[in-house]
């Protein structure tokens, strides 16, 4: 088992290419959360904005691949489904210092919108990976 997810994989890739990365997420207060944070620190990623949720477990995914190389992914979002705009308000310094903000839709939509609006106000570029696919607000 390895820590991952779209955001985590992208953060590690950018750090390995020499970029400065602050990773914002929410994990459970469990072994998966602790292992993830340790991995990010070993990769040189700023973990100051990894929030811990004592009530919900870390998110997990099970990926199976069939004989035709088609995959099936089952996700239990766990604590990351509770990454709220109030958490991101605590990470405003990271948003302010960022050259680029990379997001995906594995966090609540109101949190995505909060970050996008905050980034817009601060004249920051945002890349949104719209996955998993779901309807987007016009705003």
Predicted regions and their residues:
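Active-site nucleophile and cofactor-binding loops and adjacent substrate-binding regions
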Residues: 1-6, 51-55
